[in-house]
A protein has these predicted regions:
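Cofactor-binding loop segments of dinucleotide-utilizing enzymes, especially the Rossmann-like FAD-
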Residues: 148, 203-204
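Active-site beta-strand-loop-beta-strand hairpin of nuclease catalytic cores
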Residues: 162-171
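Arginine/glycine-rich "motif VI" loop of SF2 helicases in the C-terminal RecA-like domain
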Residues: 188-196
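Short beta-strand-loop-alpha-helix junction that forms the active-site gateway
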Residues: 174-182
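Accessory nucleic acid-recognition modules appended to NTPase machines
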Residues: 1-158, 163
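Short, hydrophobic beta-strand segments that form beta-sheet elements in well-ordered domains
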Residues: 197-203
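Domain-level recognition of nuclease-like catalytic cores that cleave nucleotide substrates
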Residues: 204-230
């Protein structure tokens, strides 16, 4: 909490209006609603050039992780990213956890004990997403996601994380439970089968394989991602 207070003081020095801090503090709630980060949801008005400057300055502060939508993963992740469609994660998972419960009077060690023992009665999918995002970025990789429609239906699918291994695509999903549901990866793999190196689902269970899909416990994410080749 003391670190967050220092951040707040710094943000106010940069922007006395408080918008800088408002944007930063809104990230956990936006992710909790499974939203992309829409600045209009925070400011409640049409985006201005000044608002865009706030986002740019926030990105430069290195306190957040930008996460861009890719338009065509079959070509290039970086070259086909849409700079107007992005999510934001926090660059520090510890601060993210504290911010999630910052409005509770009992933000203390008990919350972290329950978190580590998987006894916290909340959906923590977005917390694990932020952790994976931080791991990917710590390996000097940019963050991308992909949304696409089934060729035969109007249903949309989303690949939470899209990166590469040996110049081929690696779709990654993360689940906060032991569920093995992976419809999005299945559809993506069918559509881009020749472009894929591996497909991975991080979840709360032991190592498991479902045909070509690698299911791995979340604690193996740092080692798994570190071993990706450029």
């Amino acid at each position: 909490k003391e670190i967050l207070e220092l951040y707040s003081n710094d943000f106010f020095r940069i922007d006395p209006s408080g918008m800088f801090l408002t944007l930063y503090n809104s990230i956990p709630s936006q992710l909790a609603k499974n939203n992309k980060f829409y600045i209009t949801k925070v400011t409640n008005k049409k985006v201005t050039n000044k608002d865009r400057k706030f986002i740019f300055d926030l990105l430069n502060s290195k306190t957040i992780l930008p996460f861009y939508k890719v338009n065509d993963p079959s070509l290039s992740l970086n070259e086909t990213k849409d700079i107007d469609n992005f999510k934001l994660y926090l660059s520090d998972i510890g601060l993210f956890t504290t911010m999630l419960f910052n409005d509770k009077l009992s933000t203390n060690e008990n919350i972290y004990i329950k978190l580590l023992s998987d006894k916290l009665d909340v959906n923590l999918g977005y917390l694990y997403e932020n952790a994976i995002a931080q791991i990917i970025k710590s390996n000097d990789r940019d963050l991308f996601y992909y949304v696409f429609k089934n060729d035969e239906t109007t249903r949309s699918y989303e690949i939470y994380f899209l990166t590469t291994d040996s110049n081929k695509l690696v779709p990654i999903e993360v689940k906060s439970s032991e569920t093995k549901n992976h419809k999005s990866i299945n559809e993506f793999s069918r559509k881009y089968s020749s472009k894929i190196s591996r497909r991975i689902l991080f979840f709360q269970d032991d190592i498991f394989h479902d045909e070509m899909l690698e299911l791995r416990p979340i604690y193996l994410a740092p080692l798994t991602i570190k071993n990706f080749k450029w």
